[in-house]
Amino acid sequence: MNFLETENVVKQYAGHLALNKVSIQVPQGTIFGLLGPNGAGKTTLIRIINRITAPDSGIVRFNGHESSPEDIYQIGYLPEERGLYKKMKVGEQAIYLAQLKGLSYPEARSRLTRWFEKFDIMPWWNRKLEELSKGMQQKVQFIITVIHEPELLIFDEPFSGFDPVNADRLKQEILELKAAGHTIIFSTHNMSSVEEICDEIALINRSEVVLSGNVKEVRERFKSNTYILNVRKETGGIEELRIRKEENISNSDWLTRLASQYEILSFTE
């Protein structure tokens, strides 16, 4: 059974087509990878699922029915742009946001205490958020996202800013949430993260779904003629891309074409 579906969703902003007839099916109790480069349309789709914005056309179905305002109480959303109040005390803010999600004060305090102890941040309960490191702030944001135990969890680039140890720890927490029965949408531009934890995948590029299906099946289907490129981004960082070579084109001609689009640092099959 699919817990979430979008059907032919279209969204346009000031003449820019952000989503073009996007359809996805998210099976219940799975981790669904929403993969694509920055600007592909992933965040727009997430905002529509969250009812932050409405589609111009198309349908969103939530747990078997057309999406309604009440459904947002069963969604936990961790946006890529974190939005906590820097000047507010950590515990005070966490309780306030948990209560907005429908928890009583005693229940909010109890659940938050368990999570803070689990992430080793209880000593920071009475400190202002701005006093925490970026990694600690993101742990707080993650806890607030999951605290009301929603049926659907949406994580947009959740590992951004984490060192490898804490990123791996967060992956384990996400897998535990799946084991507890939650349905999870995991949005990223990093294919390796998708392969590690996702069951299903949809690849969005230039506002359209260009590939979807079970991760293992997709990997086998596109294993041949697939190359890994490390390229330098405009911001100066390095990004890993996996690109399938077109048929009937030599490697040298293909690399020449890619070199006109990217600053290629390495190239492996």
Model-flagged regions — what are they?
Residues M1:
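Flanking scaffold residues of small Cys/His-coordinated metal-binding clusters
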Residues D71, N214, D253-L255:
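Hydrophobic side chains in well-ordered alpha-helices
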Residues S224-E269:
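Short, charged/small-residue-rich alpha-helical element at the C-terminal edge
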Residues L4, K11-N205, L211:
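ABC transporter nucleotide-binding domains
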